[in-house]
Amino acid sequence: MAKKIVGFIKLQVPAGKANPSPPIGPALGQRGLNIMEFCKAFNAQTQGVEPGLPLPVVITAFADKSFTFIIKTPPATVLIKKAIKLDKGSSNPLKNKVGKITRAQLEEIANTKLKDMNAADVDAAVRTLAGSARSMGVIVEGV
C-alpha cells in the first residue's frame, strides 16, 4: 500500500547550502520532518551544481514523517542573468535596458530548462524565455 501524502512543500534552496535555518527549518518542522536528514540529502544531491545557485525543490511529506524530494532546474531569470553576467534586472524594464541576450544563449537555457517548462519544443521554450528576458529589461536579439 502506498504511503499517505500529508502535503507538499515548495522551497528555493541554494545548491549545496541547505541548513536548518529559515526557510527550511520552519517549513519542514511544521510537518514534523527530519530537517537535518533533508539538508544532508539535498546537499549530497547538489554537489555537482554550482554552489549557491538557487534550486526549486518540491518536498513530498508523508504521514509516517518520511519524505521525498524533487530538485528542479534553476529559475529562468537566474539563468538569464548568469548568461549575460548581470547582477539584477532593470527596475523599469520599459525604459532602462540592462543588457542583450542572443537566440543562441536562449536556446542553451531552453535546453537546460525544457523538462521543467510547459513548452512543446525548444522553439516555444525560447519564446517563453525571451518574454522573461524582456520583462527584466534585457534586449532580445534574433527572436
Swiss-Prot record:
<dbReference type="InterPro" id="IPR020784">
    <property type="entry name" value="Ribosomal_uL11_N"/>
</dbReference>
<dbReference type="GO" id="GO:0003735">
    <property type="term" value="F:structural constituent of ribosome"/>
</dbReference>
<keyword id="KW-0687">Ribonucleoprotein</keyword>
<keyword id="KW-0488">Methylation</keyword>
<dbReference type="InterPro" id="IPR006519">
    <property type="entry name" value="Ribosomal_uL11_bac-typ"/>
</dbReference>
<dbReference type="Pfam" id="PF03946">
    <property type="entry name" value="Ribosomal_L11_N"/>
</dbReference>
<keyword id="KW-0694">RNA-binding</keyword>
<dbReference type="InterPro" id="IPR000911">
    <property type="entry name" value="Ribosomal_uL11"/>
</dbReference>
<comment type="function">
    <text>Forms part of the ribosomal stalk which helps the ribosome interact with GTP-bound translation factors.</text>
</comment>
<dbReference type="InterPro" id="IPR036796">
    <property type="entry name" value="Ribosomal_uL11_N_sf"/>
</dbReference>
<comment type="similarity">
    <text>Belongs to the universal ribosomal protein uL11 family.</text>
</comment>
<dbReference type="GO" id="GO:0070180">
    <property type="term" value="F:large ribosomal subunit rRNA binding"/>
</dbReference>
<dbReference type="InterPro" id="IPR036769">
    <property type="entry name" value="Ribosomal_uL11_C_sf"/>
</dbReference>
<keyword id="KW-0689">Ribosomal protein</keyword>
<comment type="subunit">
    <text>Part of the ribosomal stalk of the 50S ribosomal subunit. Interacts with L10 and the large rRNA to form the base of the stalk. L10 forms an elongated spine to which L12 dimers bind in a sequential fashion forming a multimeric L10(L12)X complex.</text>
</comment>
<dbReference type="GO" id="GO:0022625">
    <property type="term" value="C:cytosolic large ribosomal subunit"/>
</dbReference>
<dbReference type="Pfam" id="PF00298">
    <property type="entry name" value="Ribosomal_L11"/>
</dbReference>
<protein>
    <recommendedName>
        <fullName>Large ribosomal subunit protein uL11</fullName>
    </recommendedName>
</protein>
<dbReference type="InterPro" id="IPR020785">
    <property type="entry name" value="Ribosomal_uL11_CS"/>
</dbReference>
<dbReference type="InterPro" id="IPR020783">
    <property type="entry name" value="Ribosomal_uL11_C"/>
</dbReference>
<dbReference type="GO" id="GO:0006412">
    <property type="term" value="P:translation"/>
</dbReference>
<keyword id="KW-0699">rRNA-binding</keyword>
